[in-house]
Amino acid sequence: MFKFKASDLPEILTRWSARYSVFVPSGSPDNAQMRIWSRRTRKEVRFMEPDEYTNLIVAPKGFVFGEREELFRWGGHEKTCTALSAPYSSSLQEEDKILCGLRPCDTYGLAYMDRFFLGEHHDINYHWRRQHVFIVAVNCLEAGPECYCASMGTGPFAEITAHTEYGMQAGKGDGRLRTPDYGPDHKKGEKGENDWYWVEAGSDRGKALLSHVAPLLYRDLEFTGRRRKKALQEDALKTFRRTLDTSTVRQVLAAHFKDEEWDAIASSCIACTGCTRVCPTCTCFTTEEEQDTPHSGTRVRVWDSCQSVSFTRNAEFH
C-alpha cells in the first residue's frame, strides 16, 4: 500500500496526462462533470476535492458505450452488399483514458455494463472502448442526502471484483489505486490526517499507472493502511440517512403491481427518455442505417430507451 501528499495530486494528474487522456470531476457541487485535464488546461479545469461533490451529474457510461457509434460501413451493387470496414478501423481509434474521481456506485454501474456487453455475447465495439479506459474511483467518507448504496452493496467504498480488469481505485485519507479485471482501476479515499491519499494497485495495469508517478509515492505499512481504511469505512456507513431492505423487493413490487400510484407517476412522464440517458446501467440501443448513396451507407448503433413504447414494441414483436 502506498500514499501520496494531497498537494502532489495535480502533479500526478499532469504526469499521467503525458501518457493518457485524463478526465477529472470539475464544475460546481451540483453540476460536477468529467473534463479533460492536461498541463495546458490545469488552470481552467480544477479537480474537485472528494468532499466538494456527491457524484457526477451524468453517469460515465458514455466513455465505454458510445451514444452513437459506427458498427460497419457497407456498399455494393443492386443485388450485392458487402461490409467494407470493421468498427475498430474507423470511429474507435482513440487514446487510453483515465477517468479519475468516479464514485464507487458508478464503478459498479460500469461493472454491470461489462457483464452485459462482455458476457455470453461479446460486443467488439464495447470491448474496444473498454480496454482503453482506466478508472480511478474515489471512496466516499460521507453519504449524500439521497444515497442508499450501502443497502445495495455498491458503496460507500469500492471493492475489487472478479469482472474488473480495467479498474482502479484511490482515496484521500483512505483509498486504493488498483486495476482489476473490468472494473475500477484506481480507488482513492478521502481527506485523512495531514491530507494524504492512500492508494493500492490491484492489477498489472494499476501498477503501471503507479509506476509513472513512483517518485511521488511513499510506501505505507500494510497493517496501518488497512486498519485506517476499515475505520473510515465504518464511519462512512454511519452517515447514511436512507436505507433499503432489498430482501423483499420482488414480493413488494408484485403485491403493488396494479397500484394507482404508478398511474400518478406515469401521468407526469413526457417520454423525454432522460431517465434512461442518465441511468448508469441502461444498455438499451437500436441500430439505424445511414445511407450515403443508393448502394452504400453506414450501420450505426445509438442509445435507445427501454421506457419508450416503440422500444417495447420492437422488443416484443421483433
Whereabouts are the PLM-identified features?
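Histidine- and/or cysteine-centered catalytic micro-motif in compact active-site loops
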Residues: 204, 274, 280-287, 311
